[in-house]
Swiss-Prot record:
BPL/LPL catalytic domain boundaries: 34-214
Name listed for the protein in its UniProt record: Octanoyltransferase
Low complexity: compositionally biased ranges: 229-240
Pathway(s) of this molecule: Protein modification; protein lipoylation via endogenous pathway; protein N(6)-(lipoyl)lysine from octanoyl-[acyl-carrier-protein]: step 1/2
Main location: cytoplasm
Protein source organism: Kocuria rhizophila (strain ATCC 9341 / DSM 348 / NBRC 103217 / DC2201)
Subcellular location: Cytoplasm
């Protein structure tokens, strides 16, 4: 079965992070159970900081802004308007190779970013997609990746800076990296490039790499459409 994409919400209808986290968990349970095929949620979030498992308290925002602790790898990062966030919830092959999964995501993102005229690449020892140091400044991260694997299926995923305000990153040490900066497609090209301009191309590239990302399978029964929980009903606690 082909990789299935669900566009959950884009500006002006931004998606609350906790509500989307509940949705991720629901879809993850269904993929594990075999009642839903491999699915990628595409979304643009309200402003939020999230902390991966390796985040330490002293790395939290200096102004006391709320942080949502989550189970992905990595450290502290920011999501907000103008950022394309993708959550691949897919079954991995056995034996599990999470590093390989992350490498394929990097390759997908880099291919998409280059299509928009930005020479992204990888940096040894650091995950995500990067623009290397030049006359404009040091190495700059344009996309972050952080995943979690449970019962052979993935959660969380990637965030690509498209047209988002980069100033919220100034309140934290993004991903725990002190000697590099952050950037976006819009900042690098000088043209406004929104998530809605990128999402179709991202879906195409993910589909082209499906065999490298996951094990295709047919769900036991046709799955219901993915829906966010009703506003105000999110159950994800701060320690999620």
């Amino acid at each position: 079965m082909a990789l299935h994409f669900e566009r959950i919400g884009f500006a002006p209808e931004l998606v609350n992070y906790r509500e989307c986290l509940d949705l991720q968990r629901q879809v993850h349970q269904e993929v594990v159970a075999g009642s839903r095929g491999n699915t990628v949620l595409m979304v643009e979030h309200d402003p939020v900081y999230t902390a991966g498992r390796r985040t330490e308290k002293h790395e939290y925002p200096w102004d006391g802004t709320e942080v949502v602790p989550i189970g992905r790898g990595g450290k502290l990062t920011y999501h907000g308007p103008g950022m394309l966030v993708g959550y691949p919830i897919v079954r991995l092959p056995i034996p599990l190779d999470v590093v390989r999964f992350v490498r394929v995501l990097e390759e997908v993102i880099i291919a998409v970013v280059r299509d928009f005229g930005v020479p992204a690449t990888t940096v040894e020892g650091r995950s995500g997609a990067w623009v290397l140091a030049d006359e404009r400044g040091p190495d700059r991260k344009i996309s972050a990746i952080g995943v979690q694997v449970s019962k052979r299926a993935t959660m969380h995923g990637f965030a690509l800076n498209c047209s988002n305000d980069l100033r919220p990153f100034g309140k934290i040490i993004p991903c725990g990296i002190t000697d590099a900066g952050v950037t976006s497609l819009s900042a690098e090209t000088g043209n406004r490039i929104d998530p809605a301009d990128v999402v179709e191309r991202m879906e195409q590239e993910l589909s082209a790499r499906e065999a490298d990302l996951c094990v295709p399978f047919e769900p036991d029964t046709p799955a219901e459409p993915v829906r966010l929980p009703a506003p105000g009903t999110a159950t994800s606690a701060a320690a999620s």
